[in-house]
Amino acid sequence: MPLAVGTKAPDFTLPTKTAEGPKQIKLSDNFGKKNTLLLFFPMAFTGTCTEEMCSLTPALPNYEGMNAVVYGISGDNPFAQEAWSQKEKIGVALLSDYEHKVARDYGVAYDSFLPQKNLGMAGVAKRSAFVIDTNGVIQYAESSDDPGQLPNFDKIKAKLAELK
């Protein structure tokens, strides 16, 4: 079950790969400055995940205008995320939760991803969204067991506009 609205967001530091090289992103660096949109997704190089991240790229200025920073989080390693980002021209900062700790801390890790296919993949992130305010408190939370269901971006934008 995902963390509830009103809960203090668990802090984390995760790696990302930028054009300048590897970099560590710490969630709490945004506290006191910016709202944060965390978008957990199962895996890079998959259809719905590509659709989600690619559709966000042209909308990033809108999120910046709402005083929000956007991070995509998956269990892929940062080099795979970078390759996917370059191939698909994804502008969202992608963070690697390679050990699935952050997905577990936020209550959005599958016990078994696609069990009907016997993939044996525990810990994969469910498609989820969290809006965290400048005080580090979760103001919006959404998670789906259906990896094909995109988050409700209208509700996310409405919450961010409210927090602006």
Predicted regions and their residues:
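Chalcogenol-based redox active-site neighborhoods
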Residues: 1-164
